[in-house]
From Swiss-Prot:
High-level lineage: Archaea, Methanobacteriati, Methanobacteriota, Methanomada group, Methanococci
GO BP annotations listed: tRNA 5'-leader removal
Entry keyword annotation includes Hydrolase: yes
EC number: 3.1.26.5
Official protein name in the record: Ribonuclease P protein component 2
Primary gene name: rnp2
């Protein structure tokens, strides 16, 4: 069995709060493709793989993106250059950057913190999705 890496050897991450201004409602897969294409166009395949972008949460028009700490500047510049999606204009505004999801939600998205176990209890009460 493999041991987990100690915290000093793990990849350092940053969380980015985004606001996407687009005339239609976007889904998570659209946001993922926009971010990856922007990174690919700006810094290539190697830069995109180093950045390791991961969409944590998205509720139109706001989202939370996880990225490698060293590649935050590349992400900022690549998203500022992204200007069209499906031949329609798009604008991606970075609201803020933090090292925890809790701080991103509270400080930039103004969503009060709710402990994870309470979220799970709410989902159990709603029942399974159909």
């Amino acid at each position: 069995m493999l041991k987990t890496l100690p915290p000093t050897l793990r990849e350092k991450k940053r969380y980015v709060a985004l606001e996407i201004i687009f005339e239609e409602e976007l889904f998570q897969k659209d946001v993922i493709s926009i971010v990856r294409n922007a990174l690919m166009n700006y810094s290539g395949v190697l830069g995109c793989s180093k950045a390791n972008p991961w969409l944590i949460d998205y509720n139109h028009p706001y989202g939370i993106l996880r990225i490698s700490r060293e590649e935050v500047d590349n992400l900022r510049s690549s998203l500022s250059l992204a200007n069209e999606h499906r031949k329609k204009p798009i604008n991606i505004h970075i609201i803020g950057i933090s090292n925890s999801v809790k701080h991103i939600r509270e400080k930039f998205l103004h969503v009060p913190h709710e402990p994870y176990y309470k979220v799970i209890q709410k989902l159990k009460k709603k029942g399974p999705k159909k």
